[in-house]
Amino acid sequence: MRASRPVVHPVEAPPPAALAVAAAAVAVEAGVGAGGGAAAHGGENAQPRGVRMKDPPGAPGTPGGLGLRLVQAFFAAAALAVMASTDDFPSVSAFCYLVAAAILQCLWSLSLAVVDIYALLVKRSLRNPQAVCIFTIGDGITGTLTLGAACASAGITVLIGNDLNICANNHCASFETATAMAFISWFALAPSCVLNFWSMASR
């Protein structure tokens, strides 16, 4: 007796892992095809993704920036201490101006040093436009005051020492040292001001 045989033979189902791989391959092919079509229709209108650049050395929130702030504060405090150690500086307006500018410079630099330390501890980048603008304006103001006070004190020191020749009755060495410290503080401030201005202008 002849028995009929089935026309369709059963096929074992593929394992789930093979199904997942096949589905992923189909999805990738579909995505590539869609992307190619979009690129063909979009042409040159597609914008490249932005690349975030690293902060330059000396920028706010970097070890270099913290070092500059500490140097600024140190020499401003040194200028203040040396000038305040003399008992006759209040009689000269330029020296009083230097003391006031040194106090402002020291407070400003120490405040930004604290901000840099916080940014380094939490590993944040100080790229906020408002913060960079405040840093730039503050550096510009304190830098102008410090440079003006140092130049005025240098002029008075030269007048006392070279023109009037009365250093025997004054603390010319202390005046010269305080003036030099103020200039060094300003030179340390200049890179911070330039970097902040460049960062603000490049946005």
UniProtKB/Swiss-Prot annotation:
Segments crossing the lipid bilayer: 64-84, 95-115, 140-160, 178-198
One GO CC annotation: plasma membrane
Keyword Nucleus: no
Membrane topology: Multi-pass membrane protein
Chain intervals for the UniProt region annotation (Disordered): 39-58
Extracellular side: 85-94, 161-177
Keywords attached to this entry: Cell membrane, Membrane, Transmembrane, Transmembrane helix
Main location group: membrane
Subcellular location(s) of the protein: Cell membrane
Record topology, Cytoplasmic segments: 1-63, 116-139, 199-203
Membrane keyword on record: yes
Family: Belongs to the Casparian strip membrane proteins (CASP) family.
Subunit record text: Homodimer and heterodimers.
PANTHER family noted in UniProt: CASP-LIKE PROTEIN 5A2, CASP-LIKE PROTEIN 5B3
Protein name listed in UniProt: CASP-like protein 5A2
Lineage: Eukaryota, Viridiplantae, Streptophyta, Embryophyta, Tracheophyta
